[in-house]
UniProtKB/Swiss-Prot annotation:
<keyword id="KW-0560">Oxidoreductase</keyword>
<dbReference type="GO" id="GO:0042744">
    <property type="term" value="P:hydrogen peroxide catabolic process"/>
</dbReference>
<feature type="site" description="Transition state stabilizer">
    <location>
        <position position="102"/>
    </location>
</feature>
<dbReference type="InterPro" id="IPR019793">
    <property type="entry name" value="Peroxidases_heam-ligand_BS"/>
</dbReference>
<keyword id="KW-0408">Iron</keyword>
<dbReference type="GO" id="GO:0020037">
    <property type="term" value="F:heme binding"/>
</dbReference>
<dbReference type="GO" id="GO:0046872">
    <property type="term" value="F:metal ion binding"/>
</dbReference>
<keyword id="KW-0479">Metal-binding</keyword>
<comment type="function">
    <text>Bifunctional enzyme with both catalase and broad-spectrum peroxidase activity.</text>
</comment>
<comment type="similarity">
    <text>Belongs to the peroxidase family. Peroxidase/catalase subfamily.</text>
</comment>
<dbReference type="GO" id="GO:0004096">
    <property type="term" value="F:catalase activity"/>
</dbReference>
<feature type="region of interest" description="Disordered">
    <location>
        <begin position="1"/>
        <end position="33"/>
    </location>
</feature>
<keyword id="KW-0376">Hydrogen peroxide</keyword>
<dbReference type="Pfam" id="PF00141">
    <property type="entry name" value="peroxidase"/>
</dbReference>
<feature type="cross-link" description="Tryptophyl-tyrosyl-methioninium (Trp-Tyr) (with M-252)">
    <location>
        <begin position="105"/>
        <end position="226"/>
    </location>
</feature>
<feature type="binding site" description="axial binding residue">
    <location>
        <position position="267"/>
    </location>
    <ligand>
        <name>heme b</name>
    </ligand>
</feature>
<dbReference type="GO" id="GO:0070301">
    <property type="term" value="P:cellular response to hydrogen peroxide"/>
</dbReference>
Length: 726
């Protein structure tokens, strides 16, 4: 323990006493606020991927850069790379095809249709946790092999696009005809923090398949892309794996046929690696020493590479031609009898006991081995439904090829949103239902048409609350993760959205707007719905004494019911929308956390979210006609009353019951109930970060700023799916 004499002594020598000792003095070190308060609201999720982390700057235009790309020159270089074996990571059979297919698959395979997060669209495989997942062992080598090509073409091709294109070229170079390729994935420069990968604290913790239906999780174990290839919890039982396979592939929006095609197609080329015990494998890239330069899993088994490589611990080669496309996967699956065995690393796998040695060794042409399969491969033979599909593909290789081509395209493009976001010369012409297709525009309203429509909407008898509510209901389905939802298409008027409980108040305005659309014939219903919001906001601002113009960009179209996959759109139904003070279930997270989740899906910042909630409350845009959060006696006036009254110390808040979901604000002197609120309201006074923003809008000089900020955030939400405006 230091004494005053110690301090005096160090001072006498000219040394600062506080620069002595071994404490970590680097930025971010020490106990953090998250350590003290682990349940702290994650407002920081709204600050992800800002321009401050982007080395290319906010003016960088990827689509413009991509247009300068020598696309077919790039594909030629990728094709050459496939057979340029490197001594630091030798290629199996002289080809990296299997490795690149796995890289693309595992990049795209993190997508979850339930919340739209994950997927290949941001190039997240470069960052933790995905760069160090147990299921991604050795993919660091695949990415490093691509570096010379990325270096050559620079910013004309993103890492995210390059990963998927490399997988496509690997398939094509192996004799397979792919369905096409759409570029347009833009890189980000830091890990996604908003993706819930699960609560487990240890890698490869087993999850029961039923648990996957209750959470947005896409794998049966923490750190896997899909399922444990040795069967659930290393059971070694092919039949028991069927439920897990259906759950994980189903969470990606894949049906049984697509699932069978993807498993078989992905295992037609390449191999797994389990030359020796996994105890020989070193730390993953995030934990590896600095001199490894971003690589991980260095192995001390033999040479550590080539014939001595260890990845999953499984040692499986499925087909006789592992670098050329074939139907051997199904032929071998049904032709031979399979017995359980173990890899050199001790992992459970199966071997064709009655097969000759027909499988080539990846590095010694003089050696052959028997066909081998994963436990989960045999599920395709022993599960009755999977077997029917597998036998059909066995007898009809062309049907298999077609199914895999389409399923692979879906897998690798599922999180890109509508086809209008695709760029490049190989974009397929066919519209696919999972792309949420839209018809071609048939209206081109003039400025005068828009003025006339605004007058018609204003004279329709709809209130400010109804006008704002219907526009919000239409636009707020957007998900930034997979770019689904939004106002374009007017799917609010279609099933299933028209029947959602959260939209009950909003859809009551639809018949009025549909009548205006039909009578005018000048604009789509989608445009008129958004224009209704414009009219509502402008009226509310005018009532507050401000003359504002809410920007409006026409050009939306109206989708048909047959262009709308009801089952997939059901996943967009919110379990909570704090902007409308709506919550359907109380067994999922906290109300305020779900508000952050919704705001993050809408790509909002904390100030944008705050302005929108405050504005929606005073405009009366709540889903059920309740008064929760309506801290004003001027409903329909775009004022900052929500913030002024929330932060007013004259009121004391108490929960109405033990759930602590609803609260009453009572006058401290009289005890009179003045307001009621939800957690989505009170969080703006409770959370220190959100309160700091709320205090800005509650200030006496903030009304005009608040209105301008509300309008800017409102227009942003209305245009989130207007990719044609980019």
């Amino acid at each position: 323990m230091s004494t005053s004499d110690d301090i005096h002594n160090t001072t006498a020598t000219g040394k600062c006493p506080f620069h002595q000792g071994g404490h970590d003095q680097s930025a971010g070190a020490g106990t953090t606020t998250r350590d003290w308060w682990p349940n702290q609201l994650r407002v920081d999720l709204l600050n992800q991927h800002s321009n401050r982390s982007n080395p290319l700057g906010e003016d960088f235009d990827y689509r413009k850069e991509f247009s300068k790309l020598d696309y077919y020159g790039l594909k030629k270089d990728l094709k050459a790379l496939l057979t340029e074996s490197q001594p630091w990571w030798p290629a199996d059979w002289g080809s990296y095809a299997g490795l690149f297919i796995r890289m693309a698959w595992h990049g795209a395979g993190t997508y979850r249709s339930i919340d739209g997060r994950g997927g290949a669209g941001r190039g997240q495989q470069r960052f933790a946790p995905l760069n160090s997942w147990p299921d991604n062992v050795s993919l660091d080598k695949a990415r490093r092999l691509l570096w010379p090509i990325k270096q050559k073409y620079g910013q004309k091709i993103s890492w995210a696009d390059l990963f998927i294109l490399a997988g496509n070229v690997a398939l094509e170079n192996s004799g397979f005809r792919t369905f096409g390729f759409g570029a347009g994935r833009e890189d980000v420069w830091e890990p996604d923090l908003d993706v819930n990968w699960g609560d487990e604290k240890a890698w490869l913790t087993h999850r029961h398949p039923e648990a996957l239906a209750k959470a947005p999780l896409g794998a049966t174990e923490m750190g896997l892309i899909y399922v444990n290839p040795e069967g659930p919890d290393h059971s070694g039982e092919p039949l028991s794996a069927a439920a897990a396979i259906r759950a994980t592939f189903g969470n990606m929006g894949m049906n049984d046929e697509e699932t069978v095609a993807l498993i078989a197609g992905g295992h037609t080329l390449g191999k797994t690696h389990g030359a020796g015990p996994t105890s020989n494998v070193g730390p993953d890239p995030e934990a590896a020493p600095i001199e490894e330069q971003g690589l991980g899993w260095a192995s001390t088994y033999g040479s550590g590479v080539g014939a001595d490589a260890i990845t999953s611990g499984l040692e499986v080669v499925w087909t006789q031609t592992p670098t050329q496309w074939s139907n051997y996967f199904f032929e071998n699956l049904f032709k031979y009898e399979w017995v359980q065995t173990r890899s050199p690393a001790g992992a459970i796998q199966f071997e064709a006991v009655d097969a000759p040695e027909i499988i080539p060794d990846p590095f010694d042409p003089s050696k052959k081995r028997k066909p081998t399969m994963l436990v989960t491969d045999l599920t395709l033979r022993f599960d009755p439904e999977f077997e029917k599909i597998s036998r059909r593909f066995l007898n009809d290789p062309q049907a298999f090829n077609e199914a895999f081509a389409r399923a692979w395209f879906k897998l690798t493009h599922r999180d890109m949103g509508p086809k209008s976001r695709y760029i490049g010369p190989e974009v397929p012409k066919e519209d696919l239902i999972w792309q949420d297709p839209l018809p071609q525009p048939i209206y081109n309203p003039t400025e005068q048409d828009i003025i006339d429509l605004k007058f018609a909407i204003a004279d329709s008898g709809l209130s400010v609350s109804e006008l704002v509510s219907v526009a919000w209901a239409s636009a707020s389905t957007f998900r930034g993760g997979d770019k689904r939802g939004g106002a374009n298409g007017a799917r609010l008027a279609l099933m299933p959205q028209r029947d959602w409980d959260v939209n009950a108040a909003a859809v009551r305005a639809l018949p009025v707007l549909e009548k205006i659309q039909k009578e005018s014939g000048k604009a789509s219903l989608a445009d008129i719905i958004v224009l209704a919001g414009v009219v509502g906001v402008e009226k509310a601002a005018s009532a507050a004494g401000l003359s504002i113009h809410v920007p409006f960009a026409p050009g939306r179209v109206d989708a048909r019911q047959d262009q709308t996959d009801i089952e997939m759109f059901e996943l967009l139904e919110p379990i909570a929308d704090g902007f409308r003070n709506y919550r359907a279930r109380l067994d999922v997270s906290t109300t305020e956390s779900l508000l952050i989740d919704k705001a993050q899906q809408l790509t909002l910042t904390a100030p944008e979210m705050t302005a929108l909630v405050g504005g929606m409350r005073v405009l009366g845009a709540y889903f059920d006609g309740s008064k929760n959060g309506v801290f004003t006696d001027r409903v329909g006036v775009l004022s900052n009353d929500f913030f002024v009254n929330l932060l007013d110390m004259r009121y004391e808040w108490k929960a109405t019951d033990e759930s602590k979901e609803l609260f009453e604000g009572r006058d401290r002197e009289t005890g009179e109930v003045k307001y009621t609120a939800s957690r989505a309201d009170l969080v703006f006074g409770s959370n220190s970060v959100l309160r700091a923003v709320a205090e800005v809008y509650a200030s006496s000089d903030a009304h005009e700023k608040f209105v301008k900020d509300f309008v800017a955030a409102w227009v942003k939400v209305m245009n989130l799916d207007r990719f044609d405006l980019l």
